């Protein structure tokens, strides 16, 4: 394996372009994403307005079953704009990020942009440079305790902000994000009331926390194989998540927008066929919470590698690939080299 996780993706990028030069045509912005952002923002606000006179149970149920999906999709488009894939130029993309941020209440878009680009640059460099890597204090605190794992994952944003690498210096767009969001949140309080705001807040917390969609954060760089720092998800929730599960593909080619990631995998299938993949965010989330083998330090860079049994939540791991390596090689039918297909709930 290359010396760093970043180098692993760089080498794959070069190799894929050498073997499949047509992949270059997939790179570039996808401007229809702008329409998706407008529709999703309008839908989120409309739902918040619709629940203002319903029961609290209805508010919570809709947050879980509908709102979380809308909020998560908006987060996906903030991610797309972070890579300048929604419009031409960084300034236009930052403005679209502010729009997508509106129903999420917390002014997180510009801060995320800075942190996420550093994550790509320093992937797997723990102790301060990879902005998604947990701190050692966080690892020591959480340990294998199911209760602490649930708490840390549910309050992930607060842990995230406490990580040294995630300090974001102030600039004009960061301040603009705060100001625009403060005005938007005040307007939303007036428009949709307490229950509507609760709907928006709970939806956002679930989308990036204790919900099958939130398990995306776990799956992306969970070290299931020593030679693979990034993992994709090929389950059904990609359909409502704008293919954000195609994460190896994304790190290989950050300049390819979401609707073209499947095409990348189809063209360069030889480079993706033998990688470990997840098929169920739900199953991963439950395993992380309640299986004591799953720990925070299974993030790439800490050297901890999970090896569940064949009957466990990730039964592809222990099967030998066609080259004799450990690691659940994925066959063309979506199973693994032994013919065992992972469970694919959601």
What are these regions (language model features)?
Residues 74-83, 112-124, 217-223, 240-256, ...:
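Histidine-centered catalytic micro-motifs
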Residues 23-27, 53-54, 86-90, 231-233:
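Helix-boundary and loop/linker segments of multi-pass membrane transporters
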Residues 76-96:
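Aspartate-rich (DDxxD/NDxxD/DxxxD) Mg2+/diphosphate-binding motifs
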Residues 47, 85-86, 227, 256-257, ...:
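Generic hydrophobic alpha-helical membrane-span motif
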Residues 68-78, 108-110, 158, 201-226, ...:
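Transmembrane alpha-helical segments that form the membrane-embedded catalytic/substrate-channel core
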Residues 226-227, 337:
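Acyl-thioester-dependent acyl-group transfer interface
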Residues 1-68, 102-199, 259-260, 265-346:
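Non-catalytic, topology-defining segments of multipass membrane proteins
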Residues 94-102, 229-241:
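Membrane-cytosol interface motif
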């Amino acid at each position: 394996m290359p010396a760093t996780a970043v180098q692993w993706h760089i080498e794959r990028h070069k190799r894929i372009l050498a073997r499949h030069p047509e992949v270059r045509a997939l790179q570039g912005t996808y401007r229809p994403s702008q329409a998706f952002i407008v529709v999703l923002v309008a839908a989120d606000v409309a739902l918040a307005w619709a629940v203002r006179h319903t029961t609290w149970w209805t508010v919570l149920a809709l947050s879980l079953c509908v709102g979380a999906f809308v909020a998560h999709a908006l987060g996906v488009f903030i991610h797309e704009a972070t890579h300048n894939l929604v419009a031409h130029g960084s300034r236009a993309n930052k403005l679209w990020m502010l729009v997508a941020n509106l129903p999420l209440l917390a002014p997180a878009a510009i801060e995320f942009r800075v942190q996420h680009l550093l994550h790509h640059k320093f992937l797997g460099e723990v102790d301060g440079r990879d902005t998604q890597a947990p701190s050692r204090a966080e690892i020591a605190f959480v340990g294998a305790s199911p209760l602490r794992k649930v708490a840390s994952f549910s309050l992930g944003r607060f842990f995230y902000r406490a990580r040294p690498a995630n300090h974001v210096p102030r600039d004009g767009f960061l301040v603009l994000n705060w100001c625009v969001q403060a005005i938007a949140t005040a307007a939303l309080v007036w428009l949709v009331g307490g229950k509507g705001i609760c709907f928006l807040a709970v939806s956002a917390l679930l989308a990036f926390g204790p919900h099958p969609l939130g398990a995306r954060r776990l799956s992306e760089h969970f070290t299931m194989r020593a030679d693979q720092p990034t993992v994709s998800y090929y389950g059904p929730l990609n359909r409502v998540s704008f293919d954000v599960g195609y994460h190896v593909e994304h790190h290989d080619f950050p300049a390819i927008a979401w609707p073209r990631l499947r095409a990348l995998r189809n063209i360069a299938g030889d480079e993706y066929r033998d990688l470990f993949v997840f098929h169920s965010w739900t199953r991963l989330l439950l395993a992380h919470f309640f299986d004591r083998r799953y720990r925070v330090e299974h993030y790439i860079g800490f050297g901890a590698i999970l090896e569940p049994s064949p009957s466990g939540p990730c039964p592809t791991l222990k099967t030998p690939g066609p080259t004799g390596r450990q690691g659940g090689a994925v066959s063309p039918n979506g199973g693994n080299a032994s013919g065992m297909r992972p469970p694919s709930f959601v």
